[in-house]
Amino acid sequence: VTIRFTPEATIELEDVLGYLAAHSPGGARNVSARIQQVLSNLSEYPLTGMRTSLEPMRRVAVTPYPYLIFYLPGDDEIIVVGIRHAARDPSSMPDQP
């Protein structure tokens, strides 16, 4: 299963890592590595994440960090539609593309 980012998700990831890098370069590296681990797990087990009210969208936590990855699972492809800090207003979470 391949993983593809929407343009919005790419911007969100760059924003998260850019913010972290400005305040803690080591923290940015750790969060980036953990996001990659979570995405690797999703490529093997695409239904791992929790269902959302916007089915078929799912979300998975980037533990121990406070980030959520929102994605659409598919047979051959996972589409990442958003990466958000868990404390953000729920109404700002992504819709389906």
Segments from the language model and where they lie:
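Basic, Lys/Arg-enriched alpha-helical interface segments
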Residues: T2-M57, G74-E77, M93-Q96
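Short, conserved catalytic or interaction motifs in soluble domains
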Residues: L47, V62, H85
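Structural motif corresponding to alpha-helix initiation and N-cap regions
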Residues: L54, P64-Y65
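Enriched for short, Lys/Arg-rich terminal
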Residues: Y67-L68, L72-P97
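Conserved strand-loop elements at the edges of beta-sheets that form or border functional pockets
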Residues: P7, V62-P64
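Short hydrophobic/aromatic beta-strand element in the GNAT-like acyltransferase core
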Residues: M57-R59, L68-I69
